[in-house]
Structure formats: structure tokens, C-alpha cells
């Protein structure tokens, strides 16, 4: 028996709009486990850097993402799970690095503009990683226990469900 989607609805979105969805990204069990290595990640990073260097007016092309939205509260990633996972890991690394830079930055008038710009970037990343608006961000920063239950991506692959049997 083959189940077909009743409707395929393509949507062009920015990466920010895609990642800021409130539903949990879910990797179905029939999808392969995360397998990108440093070389794959480096290619993505180089592609992003090249886009930034071009100072292009068109949005960055993240690639085609296919999502099954039939499960309430979840976005089942049919295609694009490797890129999505890698991009979320990249955002977490950027969050850590920007936080470190801000903590070590001199609080001078000359650095004020850079500090504001970095803080805005950090706020945007925080909103994606912790599903938090500015008000909720302040609550989380005061009590990090409030971030413990936040889930962005769920991997229910066979490899994850039966990892003890794979030894």
C-alpha cells in the first residue's frame, strides 16, 4: 500500500524563518543517522562564507528541504536532515564563540557598535536554539534549568533506538 501526500506545497523561506518554527524537527526512523564528517561541514561553511563574501542581495540557498507536516507538533524531515542538524550545530558553536567574545570584549565607546551587533546576532541565535523570545531569554539566562526541556530536533532512527544491539 502506498500512501501519497494529498498536496505538496512548496514554500520559499529564509533559513531564520525555517529554523524558528516552534514545532520539533524530527528525523524519522527510516532516515540514516547523522553522518556528516568534518569535510562535509567544512564545505557547508565555505559555501556560507562565499555567499557572505559576494555580498549578494538574493537570500542564501540552503537547499531543498522536504518536510512531512502531518504529525501535530513535529516537522518530519524527509530530506535535508543532515544540513539542518549541521546548521543547528553551527549555530550552537557560534553562540558559544560570540558569548566568549562578548565576555572578553572591552566595554569602550569604540567597541559599542560591534558589541550591539554581536548581541543582536546572539539574540537571534538564542531565539532559534532555545525557542525563546527576548522575555523568555532573560528568564533562561537567570535560570538555565528552564532551558533543559527545550528540544529542537529529535532523532528516532533505528540506530538510535537500538544502539545497544549494534555492538
Residue spans for each PLM region:
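Glycine- and hydrophobic-rich flexible loops that cap the catalytic core of alpha/beta enzyme folds
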Residues: 4-167
Amino acid at each position: 500500500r502506498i500512501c501519497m501526500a494529498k498536496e505538496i506545497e512548496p514554500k520559499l523561506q529564509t533559513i531564520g524563518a525555517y529554523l524558528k518554527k516552534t514545532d520539533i524537527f524530527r528525523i524519522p526512523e527510516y532516515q540514516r543517522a547523522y553522518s556528516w564528517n568534518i569535510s562535509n561541514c567544512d564545505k557547508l561553511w565555505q559555501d556560507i562564507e562565499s555567499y557572505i563574501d559576494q555580498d549578494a542581495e538574493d537570500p542564501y540557498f540552503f537547499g531543498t528541504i522536504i518536510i512531512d507536516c502531518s504529525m501535530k507538533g513535529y516537522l518530519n524531515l524527509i530530506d535535508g536532515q543532515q544540513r539542518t542538524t549541521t546548521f543547528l550545530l553551527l549555530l550552537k558553536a557560534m553562540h558559544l564563540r560570540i558569548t566568549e567574545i562578548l565576555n572578553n570584549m572591552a566595554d569602550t565607546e569604540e567597541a559599542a557598535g560591534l558589541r550591539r551587533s554581536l548581541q543582536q546576532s546572539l539574540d537571534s541565535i538564542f531565539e532559534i536554539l532555545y525557542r525563546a523570545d527576548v522575555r523568555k531569554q532573560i528568564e533562561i539566562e537567570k535560570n538555565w534549568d528552564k532551558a533543559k526541556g527545550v528540544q529542537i530536533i529529535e532523532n528516532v532512527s533505528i540506530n538510535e533506538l537500538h544502539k545497544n544491539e549494534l555492538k
